[in-house]
Amino acid sequence: MSLTKEKKAEIINTFGGSDKNTGKTEVQIALYSRRISDLTGHLKEHPKDKHSRHGLLKLVGKRKSLLAYLKNTEIERYRQVLADLDLRK
């Protein structure tokens, strides 16, 4: 269910440019998006899992705040992230 080291490193390399650039906003948004999609799949199988649903809502809120920050500071990077991750806004 959780991200493996390899998948996490792949996401970091794709959005950060190098494996050391983990603090970049795009990397954080991509990692949150991957965890959100994993949790969504889990909740489809286990609809009564309220604790996981609460965690999912927290992750969505964190991703939303990072997207808002990116939109206010770098609109072009924001649009690129939306296109790369197939997020709607």
Swiss-Prot record:
One cellular component term from this protein's GO annotations in UniProt: cytosolic small ribosomal subunit
Database matches in Gene3D superfamilies: 6.10.250.3130, S15/NS1, RNA-binding
Keyword annotations from UniProtKB, A to Z: Ribonucleoprotein, Ribosomal protein, RNA-binding, rRNA-binding
Alphabetical GO biological process terms: translation
InterPro entries listed in its UniProt record: Ribosomal_uS15, Ribosomal_uS15_bac-type, uS15_NS1_RNA-bd_sf
GO molecular function: rRNA binding; structural constituent of ribosome
Function: One of the primary rRNA binding proteins, it binds directly to 16S rRNA where it helps nucleate assembly of the platform of the 30S subunit by binding and bridging several RNA helices of the 16S rRNA.
Family note: Belongs to the universal ribosomal protein uS15 family.
Subunit structure: Part of the 30S ribosomal subunit. Forms a bridge to the 50S subunit in the 70S ribosome, contacting the 23S rRNA.
Protein name: Small ribosomal subunit protein uS15
Provenance organism: Prosthecochloris aestuarii (strain DSM 271 / SK 413)
